[in-house]
Amino acid sequence: MDEHSIMQAVAVARGARNIEVFTGAGMSADSGLETYRDPETGVWSKVDPQAMASIDAWARDPEPMWAWYRWRAGQAMKARPNAGHETIAYWEGSHLVDAVHVTTQNIDNLHERAGSTEVTHLHGSLFEFRCSICSKPWRDDGDYPREPVERLAPPTCSLCGNPVRPGVVWFGEALPQEEWAVAERRMREADLVVIVGTSGIVYPAASLPVLAHQRGVPILEITPKETDLSRIATYSWRATAAEGLPALVRRLGV
């Protein structure tokens, strides 16, 4: 984006009071966590999503999936929030805005660890667990494998004895109703939407920014490459989260 367009985008952002930040896997890429759909390095280039992210696979044999998600949780805990995460949290705490809300498709906890307090997880979390049958929550013991392992037996529910599952949304499952309702409301109330690090191809999550677009709300996209959401963006910056977000907020004088 040329300098004139950058200054226009900054002027629009400077007048906003209620910010909605919509993030995807690219948000955490600068923290060393893999994205999902990169053909060479993405998560789904290395494992079959139907084997590691479906309720049918869990019902057949939960041990490989439990091992994989426990290892991923450990990797996420080793990662550190990057400058993009930290900038969002800093923006939230500034006196120039009324609110900075985050709606994320990510299942890590880097937004929270950076200091953001208003975070909605559309696809669940690596750090939340529940019984696969009765849904009773299970408290994470923080015991993560240091290296990938092929199988781990999941713990059993203290109430009904069935396996405890990761609190993430698998393919074919509905998004959590409460989180979806919050995300919809925030998109309808925002006066600026900032899209960061998402390909915009995973639905229904990708439909959320359209709600703001239909109201004429300015949308700023920060992502290294053009995406399916670029068409509705008022301004698109070709930058990573760790580059683009600090540059934006620095220009705002926050």
Swiss-Prot record:
EC class: transferase
- GO terms under cellular component: cytoplasm
The residues listed in the UniProt record as binding Zn(2+), with positions renumbered to this chain, are: C131, C134, C157, C160
Obligatory cofactor(s): Zn(2+)
Instruction: Enumerate the catalysed reactions.
Output: N(6)-acetyl-L-lysyl-[protein] + NAD(+) + H2O = 2''-O-acetyl-ADP-D-ribose + nicotinamide + L-lysyl-[protein]; N(6)-succinyl-L-lysyl-[protein] + NAD(+) + H2O = 2''-O-succinyl-ADP-D-ribose + nicotinamide + L-lysyl-[protein]
Give the co-factor note.
Answer: Binds 1 zinc ion per subunit.
Residues reported to bind substrate: Y69, R72
Subcellular localization, as worded in the UniProt entry: Cytoplasm
Give any GO molecular function from the UniProt entry.
Answer: histone deacetylase activity, NAD-dependent
| Keyword terms, alphabetized | Cytoplasm, Metal-binding, NAD, Transferase, Zinc
Q: Which cysteines are cross-linked by disulfides?
A: none
* Residues involved in NAD(+) binding: 24-44, 105-108, 197-199, 241
* SUPFAM superfamilies hit by this protein: DHS-like NAD/FAD-binding domain
Residues covered by the Deacetylase sirtuin-type domain: 1-254
List the active site: H123
Q: EC number(s) of the enzyme? A: 2.3.1.286
Q: Which PROSITE patterns match?
A: SIRTUIN (PS50305)
The Swiss-Prot or TrEMBL record describes its family as follows: Belongs to the sirtuin family. Class III subfamily.
Domain note:
2 residues (Tyr-69 and Arg-72) present in a large hydrophobic pocket are probably involved in substrate specificity. They are important for desuccinylation activity, but dispensable for deacetylation activity.
Q: What is this protein called?
A: NAD-dependent protein deacylase 2
UniProt organism field: Corynebacterium efficiens (strain DSM 44549 / YS-314 / AJ 12310 / JCM 11189 / NBRC 100395)
Q: What is the primary gene name for this protein?
A: cobB2
